[in-house]
Amino acid sequence: MSAQGHRLTAPVNSEKVYIVLGLSFALISITFLLSRNNLPHVGDNIHSLPHGDAYRDGTKAILYNSPNFGSRTSLNNSKNAAFAAVLLLSLLIYGSRCLSQRNHLCACGNNHSSN
């Protein structure tokens, strides 16, 4: 058997798979947390008015005021959601740029930089 029959190969680099899985999990978690309804249940068993509203029919009149957040901040308001989206995109762009600027050792043995 000749020496050329057995070549050593580097193990498969699965780092990018784990990065994609981690970023996907983070994006799904952020989307879930920003889109879930944390408002208290307001109304009765037939009429649900979580954002405050008025309902009137022939026998019943309901008037619920909207929830007062006061000094509390809500993740559901559009300013915070937009800020979170911009921050997340900025971090993703920065992270992908840092990962792409690493020096990679090529199969030819040369150290190539992607600058």
Swiss-Prot record:
Pfam families the UniProt entry points to: Plant_vir_prot
Q: Which GO terms describe its cellular component?
A: host cell endoplasmic reticulum membrane; membrane
State the organism named in the record: Potato virus X (strain HB)
UniProt family annotation: Belongs to the Tymovirales TGBp2 protein family.
Miscellaneous comment text of the record: TGBp1, TGBp2 and TGBp3 seem to act together for cell-to-cell propagation. TGBp1 is the main movement protein that physically cross the plasmodesma with the viral genome. TGBp2 and TGBp3 would facilitate TGBp1 function.
- Whether Transmembrane counts among this entry's keywords is yes
One of the protein's GO biological processes: transport of virus in host, cell to cell
Q: Where are the transmembrane segments?
A: 14-34, 75-95
- Lumenal membrane side: 35-74
What function does the entry list? Plays a role in viral cell-to-cell propagation, by facilitating genome transport to neighboring plant cells through plasmosdesmata,.
Subcellular compartments: Host endoplasmic reticulum membrane
Task: Outline which residue ranges sit on the Cytoplasmic face.
Answer: 1-13, 96-115
Against InterPro entries, the record matches this protein to:
Plant_vir_prot
The protein's name in its UniProt record: Movement protein TGB2
What UniProt keywords are attached to this protein's entry?
Host endoplasmic reticulum, Host membrane, Membrane, Transmembrane, Transmembrane helix, Transport, Viral movement protein
